Curated annotation (Swiss-Prot):
GO terms for cellular component: cell surface; extracellular region; phosphopyruvate hydratase complex. This is Enolase. It comes from Chlorobium limicola (strain DSM 245 / NBRC 103803 / 6330). It is found in: Cytoplasm; Secreted; Cell surface. It catalyses: (2R)-2-phosphoglycerate = phosphoenolpyruvate + H2O. Mg(2+) binds at D251, E297, D324.
Amino acid sequence: MPIIRKVLARQILDSRGNPTVEVDVYTENSFGRAAVPSGASTGIHEAVELRDGDAGIYLGKGVLKAVDNVNTVINDALKGMLVTEQEEIDEALLALDGTPNKSKLGANALLGVSLACAKAGAEYTGLPLFRYIGGTMANTLPVPMMNVLNGGAHADNTVDFQEFMIMPIGFSSYSDALRCGAEIFHALKSLLKSKGLSTAVGDEGGFAPNLRSNEEAIELVIEAIGKAGYKAGSPTDKGGLGEAQVMIALDPASSEFYDSAKKRYVFKKSSKQELTSLEMAEYWEKWASDYPIISIEDGMAEDDWEGWKILTDKIGSRVQLVGDDLFVTNSKRLAEGIERRVGNSILIKVNQIGTLTETLQAIDLAKRNGYTAVISHRSGETEDSTIAQIAVATNAGQIKTGSMSRSDRMAKYNELLRIEEELCGQAKYPGASAFRV
């Protein structure tokens, strides 16, 4: 019987050198290990990441309290449970915490346990994790959102918007799409060097040069696509119709430059201009007309529901509008967004909500209501590649896991290559059909 015998946590370091939680789950016949990611630009509605707060140790970012919660309270509660009963395990974790935002035990403690249990369950059944979670129909490799140029909170430069990404849609296989992304990444590096610009990378592996404007950033990415020998879409392609091979995705992380007191979007790092919600929506409308943009994440601030509605009404029929800080992988927040008819996609970050079951529920709710789901990493990552497995398990069709550098990002891309190989002829790459616009 796959009965949980021991749950053991430890403090390890993430890709930014900050402490995070790693959990091992042991049964008589199987073992699972999971490491928890951490964000830089976090939404105020996210589940609580429990930190120690001792400024003299890891600058207050230690996670020994969360580790202790796993090794005592959670270990005692889960011992004797069947590791294959994922929903029961996650329900037990939620009951142990008892708070709406996981502030008692910490979402970082709960998530590590939840994912490690899933891995131990998969090992017990002899199935890969994507098959264990998703069943026999799990066969869709995701279109990657590759973050090749960074700004905002992810970089020390003059670019307001956090992520400029490429999406290789005009390919029949994931491996070909990955090659396209890698070649564009190297073309962009060469282009930046030729212009005397920095090729230092940000937290997620994208370049972070000092540029004159946000417009220069997106234009450099488009130039790199052509330099690599690929065809960027046109603004009228609407999801890659025609001969487009690559489209652009953005994550401005607008909550980071929204002044709630002024109710203005303030471009602090570049032009210093201040925009109302209507003006910000019109700004994105113009960009969607001028550039081959297929997806915008957090185009408006997390609590600017009015702004989100304006933006959705303006371009939601032709651009994927992804809610990250808006929805925070939370089914209740997503349900509110569906009711208000804002956005048309949800970003899925497992540590925003804290358990695998709640993550899968959010994805299911999105799909049932015609929203797409984008499985995502965090800026503080580890070598753990669970999100690659979840992307295939749920047939999400899209994944956001950084640039073509830094091994913490490449671990996810390489895991998807292995899954594609394992699926062999069953593997599907959706390309432009991953979008519903």
